[in-house]
């Protein structure tokens, strides 16, 4: 009987996991009924196995499921905000929002190399929305998160694998206020970010007119300090929405990574002093829409500041649901502050382990107003490293995922006319998906070569230029032959001293 109870428990957990796979609780209930009302145990187990295999096979064959970008294993993740990122005991830990019948939960994965990820049991469930992880006074990882309807909250880790957490009995740390409360209207209990400074805990409470609260103890009492922002900067209003906040020391400055639901992913550079943030500079990290969203970062043992963001699936909701999954993150970006006080960004060296089948071209010239198809370089899971020196060219770059007749193609290029790095997806697909031009401000200085790193991963194109700018788009080509790579130049010629290409090994299990 004991063995039977154990096996029933295994099937019960498998059934619940399948409910997450498909979002179909009725199927899980049917499987449980087969077990507990006398149905054959072996048949129920085999039925589950077959369904799981079928889903895995479906995901393996999905033409738009990225191979080396971090993706959800299965099911609906919208939003798919990265949360609680922390480097702990030699491992990178990344939490993320997913949805099931309980509502919003935090999934969890860890890695030692930022490439291969082990998925952990779901330990933070029901009512978990955006938040972060920091080390408390006792040296224990602590989550500060939005507890949906209840307000902002805290939880502490109970093991070094960060699998088990205890939510504070004093949660929420600061309740939502109502009419008549002395602090009503001064802050919103939303998208918190917590940290320890000296002997004091601080937290940003996000939303419009974001606030600072503080306490000497995690359990409180928490006190309202005042506005996060000391003043405005540029044309950004002091009341601009600050959500998914991430504040940290950055060189001789502080960086505030965040989003607003109007401006998308963005950042401030400035100073943290007198319990306020004094912004000096503001820039966006997405421009045409909010498809690059909800940034989250950590500091690792090498001193690297590494960030992730959710990249949105732009297909119709019905299409996303039928695919059996939805949730992709951008490649991890290493951020640092240059000597001139501006942001620099690149990729972790660890990603190079995915490269294979290297190809190199040297001293190529693309004539004015012409194209050059690279016959030996093609694919939809590749990395390109291209150095381009313009000679009068006004628009020059590379087309990826291009069909032979040009019906489908995605353009990656520098536009000297408006000094921007662009991805044009207007011809990326004959089917659905956003048609737009993403354009990030970027200027080549006199005589400077354009140094592109282009990552194509099925439905994702990410581009890095001269370690100063990055842009991203989702694409959904419909043709099997939309795998071409084409150099192009307009308004003048361009020289390509060196072009390197690699196929990229998938790191996701399916």
Tell where the protein language model's regions lie, with residue ranges.
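Hydrophobic core segments of beta-strands in well-ordered, beta-rich domains
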Residues: 80-99, 120-122, 130-156, 173, ...
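Bacterial N-terminal signal peptides
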Residues: 28-39
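Repetitive beta-architecture junctions, highlighting loop-to-beta-strand starts
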Residues: 104-106, 150-153, 208-210, 220, ...
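Boundary at the C-terminal end of the N-terminal hydrophobic targeting segment
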Residues: 42-44
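Bacterial N-terminal signal peptides that target proteins for export
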Residues: 4-29
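Beta-rich accessory regions
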Residues: 52-56, 272-277, 282, 286-290, ...
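Conserved Ser/Thr-centered positions that define the repeating blades of beta-propeller domains
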Residues: 111, 155-159, 212-216, 270
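Surface loop/turn signatures of beta-propeller and other carbohydrate-active proteins
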Residues: 46-84, 115-135, 162-196, 221-246, ...
């Amino acid at each position: 009987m004991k063995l039977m109870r154990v096996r029933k428990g295994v099937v019960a957990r498998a059934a619940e996991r399948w409910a997450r796979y498909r979002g179909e609780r009725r199927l899980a209930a049917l499987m449980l009924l087969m077990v507990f009302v006398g149905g054959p145990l072996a048949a129920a187990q085999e039925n589950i196995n077959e369904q799981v295999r079928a889903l895995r096979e479906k995901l393996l064959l999905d033409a738009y499921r990225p191979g080396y970008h971090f993706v959800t294993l299965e099911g609906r993740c919208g939003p798919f905000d990265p949360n609680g990122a922390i480097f702990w005991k030699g491992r990178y830990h990344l939490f993320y929002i997913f949805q099931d019948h309980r509502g919003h939960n935090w999934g969890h994965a860890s890695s030692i190399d930022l490439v291969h990820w082990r998925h952990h049991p779901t330990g933070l469930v029901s009512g978990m929305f955006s938040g972060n992880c920091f080390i408390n006074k006792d040296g224990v990882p602590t989550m500060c998160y939005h507890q949906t309807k209840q307000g902002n909250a805290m939880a502490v880790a109970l093991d070094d694998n960060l699998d088990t957490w205890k939510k504070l009995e004093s949660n929420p740390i600061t309740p939502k206020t109502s009419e008549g409360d002395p602090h009503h209207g001064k802050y919103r209990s939303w998208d918190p970010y917590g940290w320890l400074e000296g002997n004091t805990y601080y937290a940003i409470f996000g939303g419009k007119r974001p606030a600072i609260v503080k306490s000497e103890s995690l359990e409180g009492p928490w006190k309202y300090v005042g506005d996060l922002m000391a003043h405005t900067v540029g044309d950004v209003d002091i009341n601009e929405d600050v959500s998914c906040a991430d504040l940290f020391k950055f060189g001789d400055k502080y960086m505030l990574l965040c989003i607003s639901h109007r401006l998308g992913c963005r950042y401030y550079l400035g100073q943290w002093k007198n319990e306020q943030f004094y912004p000096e500079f503001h820039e966006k990290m997405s421009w045409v829409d909010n498809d690059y969203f909800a940034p989250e970062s950590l500091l690792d043992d090498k001193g690297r500041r590494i960030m992730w963001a959710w990249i949105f699936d732009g297909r119709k909701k019905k299409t996303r649901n039928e695919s059996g999954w939805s949730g992709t993150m951008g490649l991890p970006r290493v951020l640092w502050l240059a000597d001139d006080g501006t942001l620099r960004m690149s990729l972790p060296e660890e990603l190079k382990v995915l490269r294979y089948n290297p190809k190199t071209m040297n001293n190529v010239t693309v004539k004015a107003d012409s194209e050059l198809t690279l016959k030996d370089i093609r694919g939809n899971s590749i990395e390109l490293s291209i150095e381009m020196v313009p000679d009068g060219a006004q628009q020059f770059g590379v087309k990826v995922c291009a069909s032979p007749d040009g019906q489908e193609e995605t353009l990656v290029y520098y536009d000297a006319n408006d000094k921007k790095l662009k991805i044009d997806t207007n011809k990326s697909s004959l089917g659905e998906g956003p048609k737009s031009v993403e354009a990030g401000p970027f200027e080549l200085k006199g005589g400077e070569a354009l140094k592109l790193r282009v990552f194509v991963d099925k439905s994702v194109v990410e581009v890095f230029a001269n370690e100063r700018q990055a842009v991203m788009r989702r694409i959904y080509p419909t043709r099997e032959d939309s795998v071409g790579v084409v150099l192009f130049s307009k308004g003048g010629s361009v020289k390509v001293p060196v072009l390197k290409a690699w196929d990229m090994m998938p790191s996701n299990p399916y």
